[in-house]
């Protein structure tokens, strides 16, 4: 299902910052595809290169790290509107994996075109930096939950976050 950025239902959500028609057009121009994946599909492989950045259009996913003994630690959950794969695009390889928790739809943005767009529209680059900082604050909260909260407090914090 191909969706134009101009018709994206996520833009109507009050949680998202409005962007100019010019910025929206530029994003729509570089968007390459709309990918549909089933629950359990690997979106990003830990240690792998990823030439794309995605926006989660629908469904849920989670970011995780696999421990040496095979256990997985969920780092956080990704919901519609979240940027997926930014870390993997910034470094040579992803430091974590991302898996679809439910069936998902992703808008695919080629990394090189995104970087070029940031040079043309620094306001968008700032917005993405803000998203990265916001994500970091969630990770800080998750670390606090794991290290210092009781099981009941961890459950409550997760519900509030979602």
Residue ranges of each PLM-predicted region?
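Residue-level recognition of specific faces of alpha-helices
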Residues: 26, 52, 74-77, 97, ...
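Conserved active-site beta-strand element of glycosyltransferases/polysaccharide synthases
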Residues: 107
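A generic structural signal for short hydrophobic patches within well-formed alpha-helices
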Residues: 83, 114-115
